[in-house]
Amino acid sequence: MSELLDHRGRPRIAVTGMGIKCPAGTDVESVWSTMRAGQSMAAPIELFDASDLEVRFACETRNFDPVSYFGPKDVRRQDRVTHLGYAAAADAIESAGELGADPEQCAVVAATGVGGLTTLEENCHTFYERGPSRVSPFFVPMMMPNATAGVISMKFGFTGPAFCVSTACAAGTNAIGEGVRLIRDGSAQVVIAGGTEAFTAVTVAAFARK
């Protein structure tokens, strides 16, 4: 049997690059070291004021500066969920090296459980406290679940399929599976696949309910 085929005779799919931004670290090596050490990432919440919450600790992604990936202007036009997802994708693409495929053969499947909740919460607060004229014109493109897939595609010039998978905690794994399908059915030669999420005060409050 050809080394290019699996035991079912299907084309083998290779992972050529990886990127990660998570509580255990902001690169593959540091995350692997943290996991092997069995180190807990739980700590007091610093992303927002959690003093009124019943639960005031969580696992945050720390030591991450989205400006280094977006620049000082563009970073304000993206939700934190996109900051994390795009940065991880950019690192994965860099580690993969030459992609070896035309832009129309490069696809993106970026998963999320919900999407830009930070943007949603902030703009709902603005709407009710300061009026509709103060809502950000970037509100919809910042909070929609497929924002990360769109940003990755546009910034890297990919013109193949680009979409979001939203299946709760299974979303990232489902995205990888969809990437495999795209390659096997000939819809793409390269797929950037993974998941991203960013918790907020409201999500912490919801999960803390008894």
At which residue positions do the language-model features occur?
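Generic hydrophobic secondary-structure packing signal
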Residues: S30, T34, V81-A88, A171, ...
